[in-house]
C-alpha cells in the first residue's frame, strides 16, 4: 500500500512540474504592447583568454530566474495568476512566483558603462562594450560583447614614505607586495590589496589610528605603450583639530582593565583570563592580537559576549608610563584597554524525549542532560548525559523476551585550551584549542543477547583560522565490549550451526578490547571547498607490549589482555566536496568519499562498528541503508543482510544540482555512484572481495530528485532515488534498471536532516 501511495505521489509531482513548465512557455502573452520580455542576457568576449561571465554582476537587468538553470518555473507560476488579487489563489501564485522582467533601454546603456568601467579597473584601459539585441515575438535577448583589448602592466612600482620609522618597518616586507620582478597587471584590486597589506602591518605594529585612506597612488603611463609607472604615497597623520600634519603616532598598551559585565561578577581564574588575553601592558597595539583575544573569549562557554574598548591615556599618565618602560615622550602614546566580559548561566538541564522506529519496531527513548560551563572556574564544560530506550521487537520466535532495553551514561569534560606538559604558553594562547575527556557506559539487553560497552577517550581539537584548517587528535580512545549473556537459541541458529559459520558474525558477538589513536585534518574554505582526511590505528602499542610480555592466547590464536582479545587494524578516510555556484539560485555540488580499513596482526576481521556500509541518504540513494554491497553480493532472498552487507573499503561519487524553488523550499537533482568491498575473501560474502579488474563493473549507480525545507539553522531533506545500475546482477534487465525501470523494485525514499555533503 505504501509503495502504491508513493507511486501516485511521484506521478502527481511529475504532472505538476510538467504543467508549470508548459505555463512558463506561454508567459509572453501577458507582455504589454510596445514592451519585450527580457528572455535572456548573454555576455560574450572577443578575447579567448577573457572570461566575460566574471562581470555578470555589473549587468543591471537580469532575466527571470530559472530552476536548475533551465526552467523559468517562477515566471510561469506568476503568469498563472489572474488579475483579481482578491482571490487567495491569485495572491498565492504571485507570491511564490516571480514578476516578468521587461527590457529597459536605459538600464542597458548604464550596464554598458558599468561593464566598461569594470574592465578599466581590471587594467583594460582601452576596453569597449558592444550591445545588441535579438527579438523573437515579444521576447528579447540582450547581448553584451566585451572587447577588453590588451591589459596595462605595472612597469615600475615605487614607495613615497616620509615617515622613517614606518619606512623601516615596511622595508623587509616590500617583496611580499607588488614586486615588478614578477609581472603585475595594473588593476584596482592589486593596488587596493597593497593598501590593505600595509595597513595590516602597521596596525599590528602600534599604529592604532592608521587606516588605508592614508595611502594613495599616482600613475604615469608612457604614450604608445601599455606600461605604467606607479608610486605609492603614504601621507602624514592629520586630525580634525590639528591643521599641521605630523608623524603617525605609535601606541603601546599602558593599562588593561577587566570589567565584569554584570553585578554578579565573572568567576574566572586570573590565569584563564591572562592566557586568553594577548593585549598586555608594554606591548605595541596589535589588531591581530585584538582579534585573537576576541576569538579566545568567544570559545569560553562561561562568557556570553566580550566588548573591548580603547581610549588614549592622558598626557601625564603617558609621561609616567614612559618613565616606567624607559621610553621618552613623545615617541609613544599609550592606550588604556577596557575588556568587558559578560558570563552565561553556569548550569543548565535539558530533557529530550524521542520516538524510534527501527525496521518497523516502535519504541521510545529519553535523554536527560546536565551541563556546567564553568566547573573549575576556568570555563571548563562538564556534561553528563543519561539515556534510556525501550523498543518492542516483532517477528522473533523461540525467545522468552521480546523487548529491547538500553541504558547509558556518558560524561564529558572539555577544557578550552591545549592541556599538555609539552605545549608552550604562547601556543596555548594562539592555538584555539579544546581538550576533552569522555567516559561512557552503555547497557543493551536484547532478546538474543546482552551487551555492555565501556568507552573512554582523550582528544584534542584545535584550528588555524587564517588557513581554514581544523585538527583533531585522539590519544587514546578505549572501547571495551563485554557480552555477559547470549541466548542458546541465538547461538544455535547463528553462531554454532556449521551451515551458518561466519567469521564476521561470530567476531561481532565476542568480547573485544579496542585501544586506538587517530588524527584528522579538515579544510573548509568559504563553503565552496571542503576536504577532510583521517587516519586511525588500533592495537599497535598492545602488539609491541605483547612481543615483550607474551600475552596468553585464545582458541583462535589471538593475544589477550585482561582475558580479552584486542583488535588491531589501520584505517584511512578521505572526503572532498566542491561547490560550483552559477548564480545565487543554482549550484552544482561534487563529492568524493573514500575509505579503507585493513585488519592485521591480532585481527583477521575488522570490528563490526568500524566496517563500512553502503546505501542510505548519505550514500548511493537508490538503495536503503545496508542494502548495497559488498561488491556484487546480494542478501539471501533479496533481503538486507545486516552482518554480511558490510565491507573494508568504500568509494562514493556524487553530483547534485541544487536550485532554490520558492520561500523555504529548495530542489535537487542527483546522480550517485559507489559501493563497498572486502579486502579478503569471505565464504559468506560471495562476490564481495575487491579486485581491480571487477570494481568498475561493481559500481552501483542511482539517480533521483530531492526536496529540501531550508530553515537556515537546519534543513529537512526528502530524497527520492531510483536504481540505474545494480551490481548485484551481472547482466540482463536487472543489471540496468535505468533501461527497464520498475517503481516497486527500484524506488527508495529517504528522509534526513541536513545536506548529504
Language-model region placement:
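Outer-membrane beta-barrel pore domains and translocons
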Residues: 235, 280, 311-313, 342, ...
Amino acid at each position: 500500500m505504501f509503495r502504491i501511495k508513493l507511486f501516485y505521489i511521484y506521478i502527481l509531482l511529475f504532472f505538476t512540474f510538467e504543467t508549470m513548465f508548459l505555463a512558463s512557455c506561454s508567459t509572453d502573452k501577458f507582455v504589454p504592447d510596445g514592451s519585450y520580455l527580457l528572455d535572456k542576457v548573454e555576455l560574450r568576449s572577443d578575447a579567448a583568454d577573457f572570461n566575460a561571465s566574471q562581470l555578470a554582476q555589473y549587468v543591471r537587468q537580469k532575466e527571470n530566474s530559472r530552476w536548475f538553470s533551465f526552467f523559468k518555473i517562477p515566471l510561469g507560476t506568476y503568469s498563472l495568476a489572474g488579475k483579481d488579487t482578491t482571490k487567495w489563489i491569485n495572491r498565492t501564485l504571485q507570491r511564490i512566483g516571480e514578476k516578468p522582467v521587461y527590457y529597459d533601454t536605459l538600464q542597458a546603456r548604464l550596464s554598458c558603462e558599468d561593464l566598461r568601467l569594470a574592465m578599466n579597473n581590471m587594467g583594460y584601459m582601452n576596453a569597449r562594450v558592444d550591445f545588441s539585441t535579438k527579438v523573437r515575438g515579444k521576447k528579447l535577448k540582450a547581448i553584451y560583447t566585451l572587447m577588453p583589448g590588451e591589459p596595462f602592466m605595472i612597469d615600475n612600482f615605487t614607495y613615497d614614505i616620509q615617515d622613517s620609522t614606518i619606512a623601516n618597518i615596511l622595508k623587509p616586507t616590500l617583496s611580499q607586495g607588488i614586486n615588478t620582478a614578477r609581472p603585475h597587471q595594473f588593476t584596482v584590486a592589486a593596488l587596493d590589496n597593497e593598501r590593505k597589506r600595509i595597513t595590516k602591518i602597521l596596525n599590528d605594529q602600534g599604529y592604532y589610528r592608521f587606516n588605508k585612506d592614508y595611502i594613495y597612488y599616482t600613475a604615469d603611463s608612457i604614450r604608445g605603450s601599455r606600461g605604467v609607472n606607479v608610486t605609492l604615497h603614504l601621507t602624514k597623520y592629520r586630525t580634525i583639530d590639528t591643521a599641521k600634519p605630523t608623524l603617525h603616532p605609535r601606541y603601546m598598551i599602558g593599562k588593561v582593565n577587566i570589567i565584569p559585565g554584570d553585578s554578579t561578577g565573572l568567576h574566572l581564574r586570573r590565569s584563564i583570563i591572562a592566557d586568553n588575553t594577548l593585549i598586555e601592558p608594554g606591548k605595541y597595539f596589535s589588531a591581530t592580537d585584538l582579534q585573537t583575544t576576541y576569538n579566545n573569549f568567544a570559545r569560553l562557554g562561561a562568557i556570553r559576549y566580550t566588548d573591548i574598548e580603547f581610549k588614549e591615556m592622558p598626557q601625564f599618565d603617558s609621561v609616567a608610563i614612559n618613565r616606567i618602560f624607559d621610553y621618552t615622550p613623545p615617541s609613544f602614546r599609550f592606550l588604556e584597554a577596557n575588556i568587558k566580559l559578560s558570563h552565561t548561566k553556569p548550569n543548565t538541564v535539558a530533557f529530550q524525549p524521542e520516538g524510534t522506529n527501527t525496521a518497523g519496531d516502535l519504541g521510545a527513548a529519553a535523554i536527560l542532560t546536565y551541563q556546567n560551563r564553568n566547573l573549575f572556574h576556568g570555563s571548563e564544560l562538564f556534561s553528563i548525559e543519561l539515556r534510556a530506550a525501550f523498543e518492542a521487537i516483532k517477528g522473533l520466535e523461540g525467545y522468552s523476551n521480546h523487548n529491547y532495553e538500553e541504558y547509558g551514561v556518558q560524561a564529558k569534560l572539555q577544557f578550552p585550551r591545549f592541556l599538555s606538559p609539552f605545549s608552550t604558553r604562547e601556543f596555548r594562547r594562539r592555538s584555539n584549542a579544546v581538550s576533552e575527556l569522555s567516559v561512557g557506559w552503555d547497557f543493551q539487553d536484547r532478546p538474543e543477547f546482552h551487551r555492555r560497552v565501556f568507552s573512554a577517550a582523550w582528544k584534542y581539537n584545535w584550528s588555524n583560522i587564517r588557513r581554514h584548517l581544523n585538527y583533531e587528535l585522539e590519544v587514546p580512545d578505549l572501547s571495551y565490549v563485554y557480552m555477559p549473556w547470549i541466548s542458546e537459541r541465538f547461538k544455535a541458529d547463528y553462531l554454532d550451526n556449521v551451515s551458518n559459520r561466519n567469521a564476521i558474525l561470530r567476531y561481532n558477538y565476542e568480547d573485544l578490547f579496542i585501544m586506538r589513536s587517530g588524527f584528522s585534518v579538515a579544510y573548509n574554505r568559504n563553503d565552496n571547498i571542503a576536504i577532510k582526511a583521517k587516519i586511525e590505528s588500533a592495537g599497535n602499542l598492545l602488539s609491541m607490549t605483547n612481543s615483550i610480555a607474551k600475552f596468553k592466547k585464545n582458541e583462535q590464536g589471538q593475544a589477550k589482555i585482561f582475558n580479552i582479545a584486542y583488535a588491531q587494524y589501520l584505517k584511512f578516510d578521505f572526503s572532498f566536496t566542491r561547490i560550483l555556484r552559477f548564480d545565487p539560485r543554482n549550484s552544482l555540488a561534487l563529492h568524493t568519499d573514500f575509505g579503507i580499513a585493513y585488519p592485521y596482526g591480532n585481527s583477521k576481521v575488522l570490528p563490526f562498528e568500524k566496517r563500512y556500509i553502503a546505501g542510505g541518504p548519505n550514500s548511493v540513494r537508490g538503495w536503503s541503508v545496508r542494502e548495497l554491497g559488498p561488491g556484487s553480493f546480494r542478501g539471501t532472498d533479496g533481503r538486507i543482510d545486516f552482518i554480511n552487507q558490510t565491507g573494508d573499503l568504500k568509494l562514493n561519487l556524487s553530483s547534485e544540482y541544487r536550485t532554490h524553488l520558492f520561500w523555504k523550499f529548495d530542489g535537487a537533482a542527483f546522480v550517485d555512484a559507489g559501493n563497498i568491498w572486502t579486502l579478503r575473501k569471505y565464504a559468506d560474502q560471495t562476490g564481495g572481495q575487491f579486485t581491480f579488474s571487477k570494481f568498475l563493473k561493481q559500481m552501483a549507480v542511482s539517480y533521483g530528485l530531492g526536496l529540501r525545507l531550508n530553515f537556515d539553522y537546519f534543513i529537512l531533506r526528502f530524497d527520492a532515488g531510483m536504481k540505474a545500475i545494480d551490481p548485484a546482477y551481472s547482466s540482463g534487465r536487472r543489471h540496468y534498471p535505468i533501461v527497464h525501470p520498475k517503481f516497486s523494485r527500484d524506488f527508495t525514499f529517504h528522509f534526513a536532516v541536513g545536506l548529504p555533503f
